[in-house]
């Protein structure tokens, strides 16, 4: 008779105890993000959240996103504390362009072998992003999947729900010729274009620890995505805003037209700002054409706001008081049928 070894889940590469240890580590992170509308704490099968008081006809707005291959660079450089901020930013910034106030956030974290310290650093960043956007971290999923990911490599996705008054939804329908365009500065490449960034690093054989401006190339590339929630929501309460465009994958050419009516175009003054040094480095080191730069990267512009010319001074003053680097970047003009909807002069 042959003895059979008793196998466990841990023998198969899944450590339930490590998962439980992670949950204990991050309970305080979630607690710091709590909103009064949230019912209960972590650990339930689902998270419960009331609609905030004061809404007459509340509309829920949802969004989901990831961080893309910025994670590969972060993993290689063992910098896990800010990619969680990136994850939240990519989701909540997409909500506010429709006028929505973020309510709650959930994350999905998948790895081949769960490293509790790494995962806790990532989730701490998620908590920081939620605090910046006044959004409650109400739950998530940690999946340890041996054979699906190499070693301690990981991937993650975020999911966010917000709310907006039905009469205050921003959909670009009010955009008209004559509207002004205000830019909000980005903190760097944010979370887009990293497959090209990594290719440039490979081809140029660059040392990511080389000095760049006041810091290093690595720090410039991994700077967390700027979260615009609080200043933009304050702007929406105080100024008339016709559209907002989050400059993400697809850059200027693809994101601005998403909020423009037919027969209008955005005319951008390319001399109204200087690209941050990291974008000049990327263009030079990768010999990237300017059109491709504007197609792949934000080039220093994280968000663009369309509003009436009469609102420009008040909007700029408010945004600067909120700590944003904001400037007049262009205007909306009439466009002929079939004409491209974005010009950069």
Swiss-Prot record:
The lineage of its organism: Bacteria, Pseudomonadati, Pseudomonadota, Gammaproteobacteria, Aeromonadales. It is an enzyme of class 6 (ligase). GO terms for cellular component: cytosol. Its main location: cytoplasm. HAMAP family: AIRS. It comes from Tolumonas auensis (strain DSM 9187 / NBRC 110442 / TA 4). The keyword Glycosyltransferase does not apply. It is found in: Cytoplasm. One of its GO terms (molecular function) is phosphoribosylformylglycinamidine cyclo-ligase activity. PANTHER family: TRIFUNCTIONAL PURINE BIOSYNTHETIC PROTEIN ADENOSINE-3, TRIFUNCTIONAL PURINE BIOSYNTHETIC PROTEIN ADENOSINE-3-RELATED. GO terms for biological process: 'de novo' IMP biosynthetic process; adenine biosynthetic process. This is Phosphoribosylformylglycinamidine cyclo-ligase. Keywords: ATP-binding, Cytoplasm, Ligase, Nucleotide-binding, Purine biosynthesis. Belongs to the AIR synthase family. Its EC number is 6.3.3.1. InterPro entries: PurM-like_C_dom, PurM-like_C_sf, PurM-like_N, PurM-like_N_sf, PurM_cligase. Gene3D superfamilies: PurM-like C-terminal domain (3.90.650.10), PurM-like, N-terminal domain (3.30.1330.10). Pathway: Purine metabolism; IMP biosynthesis via de novo pathway; 5-amino-1-(5-phospho-D-ribosyl)imidazole from N(2)-formyl-N(1)-(5-phospho-D-ribosyl)glycinamide: step 2/2. It catalyses: 2-formamido-N(1)-(5-O-phospho-beta-D-ribosyl)acetamidine + ATP = 5-amino-1-(5-phospho-beta-D-ribosyl)imidazole + ADP + phosphate + H(+).
């Amino acid at each position: 008779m042959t003895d059979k070894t008793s196998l466990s889940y841990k023998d198969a590469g899944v450590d339930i105890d490590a998962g439980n240890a992670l949950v204990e580590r991050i309970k305080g992170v979630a607690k710091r993000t709590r909103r009064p509308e949230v019912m209960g704490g972590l650990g339930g099968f689902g998270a419960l959240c009331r609609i905030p008081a004061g809404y007459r006809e509340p509309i829920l707005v949802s969004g989901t996103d990831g961080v893309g291959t910025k994670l590969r660079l972060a993993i290689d450089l063992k910098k896990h504390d800010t990619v969680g901020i990136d994850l939240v930013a990519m989701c909540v910034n997409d909500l506010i362009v429709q006028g929505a106030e973020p309510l709650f956030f959930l994350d999905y974290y998948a790895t081949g072998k769960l490293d509790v310290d790494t995962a806790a650093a990532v989730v701490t960043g998620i908590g920081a992003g939620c605090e910046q956007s006044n959004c409650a971290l109400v739950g998530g999923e940690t999946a340890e999947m041996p054979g699906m990911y190499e070693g301690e490599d990981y991937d993650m996705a975020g999911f966010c729900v917000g709310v907006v008054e039905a009469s205050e939804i921003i959909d670009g329908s009010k955009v008209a010729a004559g509207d002004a365009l205000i830019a909000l500065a980005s903190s760097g490449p944010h979370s887009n274009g990293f497959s090209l960034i990594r290719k440039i690093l490979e081809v140029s054989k660059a040392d990511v620890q080389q000095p760049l401006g006041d810091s290093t190339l690595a720090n410039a590339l991994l700077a967390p995505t700027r979260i615009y929630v609080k200043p933009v929501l304050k702007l929406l309460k105080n100024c008339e805003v016709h559209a907002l465009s989050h400059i993400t994958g697809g850059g200027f050419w693809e994101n601005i037209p998403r909020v423009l009516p037919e027969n209008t175009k955005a005319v951008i003054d390319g001399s109204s700002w200087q690209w941050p040094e990291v974008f000049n480095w990327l263009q030079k080191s990768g010999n990237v054409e300017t059109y491709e730069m504007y197609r792949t990267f934000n080039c220093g512009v994280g968000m663009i706001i369309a509003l009436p010319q009469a609102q420009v001074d008040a909007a700029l003053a408010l945004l600067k008081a909120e700590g944003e680097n904001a400037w007049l970047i262009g205007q909306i003009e009439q466009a002929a049928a079939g004409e491209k909807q974005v010009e950069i002069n």
